[in-house]
Amino acid sequence: MTEKDESVKSNSEYTEEQEVKNEDTSTVENVEDTTSDSDNSSNDSSNEESSEETAVDPKDEEIQQLQLKANENEEKYLRLYAEFENYKRRIQKENETNKTYQSQRVLTDILPTIDNIERALQIEGDDESFKSLQKGVQMVHESLLRALKDNGLEEIESEGQAFDPNFHQAVVQDDNPDFKSGDITQELQKGYKLKDRVLRPSMVKVNQ
């Protein structure tokens, strides 16, 4: 083989090597481009998913607002209902109290009349007409007390009882060995109460 032929062969081999290198380089670049495209596509998908997670559905937001409004309205309703029930109970109690004590003023005004009748009954006389009159007054007195009792009027027990400032008014002190200290020895004026409410305390004499 001549030097010329060897030179041609050598150039041909060099050309083939260059083509192989170029092909390898092109393949690497294509792989890199493919990888880059894949990464970009993955990033885009990830960004889209993140954006979808972050975004709030307007319908869900509207439902939340409606739920909050419903809760507020329920609280207002429960508050108003409780206030109304308390008002009803208060009015009912006031009506019951008024019904129970509606005769208080009338009964209080009648007490002096009862006192006068009882004083009249203490007067003594031998005349038959007087006794007949006194008997009539006695009947009126008993009838009146019976009617008042039916309307809730009660006498306050005093004589022989321990003094109680809630029901008795001490006007005189006594020194009676037959009674304990603080006991009522004599009732000077009757006291009355309407159920559990005192209309007038008893005026009494209290032992020292």
Curated annotation (Swiss-Prot):
One of its GO terms (biological process) is protein folding. GO terms for cellular component: cytoplasm. Residues 46-55 have a biased composition (Acidic residues). Residues 1-62 are annotated as: Disordered. The keyword Cytoplasm applies. Its main location: cytoplasm. Signal peptide: none annotated. Keywords: Chaperone, Cytoplasm, Stress response. It is found in: Cytoplasm. It holds the Pfam family GrpE. InterPro entries: GrpE, GrpE_coiled_coil, GrpE_head. GO terms for molecular function: adenyl-nucleotide exchange factor activity; protein homodimerization activity; protein-folding chaperone binding; unfolded protein binding. Participates actively in the response to hyperosmotic and heat shock by preventing the aggregation of stress-denatured proteins, in association with DnaK and GrpE. It is the nucleotide exchange factor for DnaK and may function as a thermosensor. Unfolded proteins bind initially to DnaJ; upon interaction with the DnaJ-bound protein, DnaK hydrolyzes its bound ATP, resulting in the formation of a stable complex. GrpE releases ADP from DnaK; ATP binding to DnaK triggers the release of the substrate protein, thus completing the reaction cycle. Belongs to the GrpE family. Homodimer. This is Protein GrpE. It comes from Staphylococcus haemolyticus (strain JCSC1435). The lineage of its organism: Bacteria, Bacillati, Bacillota, Bacilli, Bacillales.
